[in-house]
Amino acid sequence: MRLAQPLYMAWCVLFVAAPILVVCAAALNGGRSMLFPPEDPTLARFTEFFVTEEVWTRALGNSILIATASAALATLLAWPVAYGLWRTGSPLARALAGAGALPFILPPIVFGVGLGFQWSFTGLLGSLPAGILSHAALHLALPLTTLSVGLAAIDRSHLDAAATMGATEGVTFRTVILPQTLPYTLSGFFFALVLSFNEFIVMFFVSASAYATVTLQIFNSLRNGFTPTMAVGAIVFILASVLAFSLVARFGDLPRLMGADESRR
């Protein structure tokens, strides 16, 4: 019985880690086929992905631009909605919060098809602004949720103390609310960023083959079979996810975001 639990944990770790190890090793293949174990190990595929192959470097640039801009926009849009919901709880605030969460709840293919029709009517189909706006709408629920958690965690006695000292609502917002919710703001931004960086379905419809992100370029490359350069793209996704969630763990209140009870911490 004592041996069963360590063996089970080891099997779980191996089950999760094995695909990652295979992908990382496959990126080292010297040929054009993705083999495991790799043949003629080389870092040439990394050079292709980051430097010499324009289709990959451009796709990476598009992914970074869309993910960063859409995450920032989603966070900015989420702030007034979350603040209004926390401050007043009015029907309008509740309706806006529900509307902000709806795209994330819908099946991505439904949302993607709808956006494709919308952008085609406005003439923005296949443009980078359409991709940024689409991902901002899709991932708005993430910063909205983290900000709602952060605002709910504010100690009301701090607000009362600020009011007693004669602070206006604007001063209270800048000196009390913003500093205490900064970890949740950053968490929402990083969550939206990493999901945007990895998203494929919605971007497939709104890009209309006019440009490619890394996810779209991997899909396009499948026509020529599995290649080591695709494995490099997968490694980039892994590193981006690890970095984003590490930053959330470092600067955000991860236990509270995961639903931990403050009184038990």
Predicted features by range, described:
Residues 18-53, 204-209, 265:
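Short membrane-interfacial helix/loop motifs at transmembrane-helix boundaries
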Residues 31, 46-55, 197-254:
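Interhelical loop and adjacent transmembrane-helix boundary motif
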Residues 58-62, 117-142, 146, 182-189, ...:
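Loop-to-helix entry region at the N-terminal start of transmembrane alpha-helices
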Residues 8, 13-20, 112, 137, ...:
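Transmembrane alpha-helices
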Residues 19-31, 62, 112-123, 190-196, ...:
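A structural signal for multi-pass alpha-helical bundles of membrane permease subunits
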Residues 34, 38, 43, 92, ...:
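Membrane-interfacial helix termini and adjacent extracytoplasmic/periplasmic loops
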